[in-house]
């Protein structure tokens, strides 16, 4: 008997480095992103994902998503999160915070259980869709079910989906509370509670909802908070609901090192003309243009389209299905320019965006920080341009003081090395729907002066034709307004030989 066991042991071969190499070779890994990166993501301890001793199936999803090595926030967070300890993490926008909490959350899920084991809360619907997509992408080999639920969609659909096993629930606070209060979403055995953009979720409008949601969780839950900014209200939440949290602060400075910031001092009526000049001179791969109100979002999008540029718009008054369509198409490169309100300032990760323009300058440093963080994602280069009028000068000074940065006047010529990549093919894009047109990397990096006169869209997407921009609206999706009562802004110049009014009226 002993001899038989010894013989069996001799014939048993343990896994070695060569077998590990084989499973990596079989992975469908995307092309390497060869763009240079800043120290925001390269200043690591030298750890590999294998050093975290996570499941091979999870590592397969990580590598197939294009990850190579953990970023600083991932190095600090993942080992601690795997132990089940509460975490309070602060890091810059675009440095890998989402994967920092998704990876340990996926590792701790038991796919054989039908219970909901993790709740991830985010403040906006677009961020919920993006976060659920990350969960599904990284966990695609784990057999885990991920569900996203947000307001603006049918409640009955969510109830039907929750009849099946849902391991990770991603959503906005109001909708999740609605489902939990009705007894549809069972969080009684949900040990993981994550809040992304926690500073927003702990604002007065959300705090009562968050505290109610915590009451549905077991007392021995793990709470993880992630954000780029932490106001004082976070401390009161930590003292009340977290147990000896591990605090991570990678914010030695507030602004991303790869983002170059400029301001242009212009009169209100000259802003569109200035924007037109920027479009004609900059090499924009994709741009996001921010306004301070939903009315101005639509008005500016209409003006941009009349100038002959392709343009999407998005704001909170649109129907959710239209917002989803705009977000999906813009991520896939269908359009080059997106005009939006602060709806898309938080967490939205679109790697191809290299220019952010504040058409309306924000009122506070927090909003400014989140806006410009839409470019220069994951240590890459980006450009932020602020159009400043006389009333904005004090806000400009205040934001510079609070962020500890200096925003320079815009030069006559902007060095393309600050925001343009020599090889645009290296910019990763999501896999687009084959039925939808997609901008090639070469076209996306070409001069933005290219005009598109037959771009037909509605519900957040303008239709250009017969010398004017038009759109179809309806209740809740951005109604056409009485333009005579609008704040007027216009252009002092012409666009490529076309005649345009100097003011919107």
From Swiss-Prot:
Any one of the GO CC terms: P-body
Gene that this sequence comes from: dhh1
PROSITE patterns the record matches: DEAD_ATP_HELICASE, HELICASE_ATP_BIND_1, HELICASE_CTER, Q_MOTIF
Ranges spanned by the short sequence motif Q motif, renumbered to the chain: 47-75
Name this polypeptide is given: ATP-dependent RNA helicase dhh1
Region (Disordered): 450-505
Motif DEAD box per UniProt: ranges: 196-199
SUPFAM superfamilies: P-loop containing nucleoside triphosphate hydrolases
Function noted in UniProt: ATP-dependent RNA helicase involved in mRNA turnover, and more specifically in mRNA decapping. Is involved in G1/S DNA-damage checkpoint recovery, probably through the regulation of the translational status of a subset of mRNAs. May also have a role in translation and mRNA nuclear export.
Compositionally biased region (Polar residues): 482-505
């Amino acid at each position: 008997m002993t001899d038989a066991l010894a013989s069996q042991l001799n014939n048993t071969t343990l896994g070695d480095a060569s077998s590990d190499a084989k499973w990596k070779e079989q992975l469908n890994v995307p092309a390497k992103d060869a763009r240079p990166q800043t120290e925001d993501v390269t200043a690591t301890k030298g750890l590999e994902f294998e050093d975290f001793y996570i499941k091979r199936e999870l590592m397969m999803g990580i590598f197939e998503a294009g990850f190579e090595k953990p970023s600083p926030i991932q190095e600090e967070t993942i080992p601690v999160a795997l132990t089940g300890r509460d975490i309070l993490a602060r890091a810059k926008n675009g440095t890998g915070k989402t994967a920092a909490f998704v990876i340990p959350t996926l590792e701790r899920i038991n796919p054989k259980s039908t219970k909901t084991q993790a709740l991830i809360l985010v403040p906006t619907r677009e961020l919920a869709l993006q976060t659920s997509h990350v969960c599904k992408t990284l966990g695609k080999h784990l057999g885990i079910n991920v569900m996203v639920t947000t307001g603006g969609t049918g409640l009955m659909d969510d109830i039907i989906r929750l009849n099946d096993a849902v391991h990770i629930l991603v959503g906005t606070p109001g909708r999740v509370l609605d489902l939990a209060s009705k007894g549809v979403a069972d969080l009684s055995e949900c040990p993981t509670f994550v809040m992304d953009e926690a500073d927003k979720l702990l604002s007065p409008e959300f705090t009562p909802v968050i505290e109610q949601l915590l009451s549905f969780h077991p007392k021995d839950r793990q709470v993880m908070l992630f954000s780029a900014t932490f106001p004082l209200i976070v401390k009161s939440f930590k003292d009340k609901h977290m147990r000896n949290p591990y605090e991570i602060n990678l914010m030695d400075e507030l602004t991303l090192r790869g983002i170059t910031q400029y301001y242009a001092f212009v009169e209100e009526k000259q802003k569109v003309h200035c924007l037109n000049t920027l479009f004609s001179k900059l090499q924009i791969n994709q741009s996001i243009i921010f306004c301070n109100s939903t009315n101005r979002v639509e008005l500016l999008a209409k003006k941009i389209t009349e100038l002959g540029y392709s343009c999407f718009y998005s704001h909170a008054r649109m129907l959710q299905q239209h917002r989803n369509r705009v977000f999906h198409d813009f991520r896939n490169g269908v359009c080059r320019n997106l005009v939006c309100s602060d709806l898309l300032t938080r967490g939205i990760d679109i790697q191809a965006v290299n220019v952010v323009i504040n058409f309306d300058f924000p009122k506070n440093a927090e909003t400014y920080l989140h806006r410009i963080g839409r470019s220069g994602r994951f240590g890459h280069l980006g450009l932020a341009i602020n159009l400043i009028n006389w009333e904005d000068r004090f806000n400009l000074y205040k934001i510079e003081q609070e962020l500890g940065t200096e925003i320079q006047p815009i030069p006559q010529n902007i060095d393309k090395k600050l925001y343009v990549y020599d090889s645009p093919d290296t910019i990763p894009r999501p896999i687009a729907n084959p039925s939808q047109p997609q901008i090639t990397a070469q076209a996306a990096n070409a001069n933005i002066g290219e005009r598109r006169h037959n771009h037909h869209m509605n519900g957040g997407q303008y239709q250009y034709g017969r010398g004017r921009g038009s759109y179809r609206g309806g209740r809740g999706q951005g109604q056409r307004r009485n333009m005579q009562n609008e704040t007027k802004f216009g252009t002092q110049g012409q666009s490529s030989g076309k005649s345009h009014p100097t003011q919107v009226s």
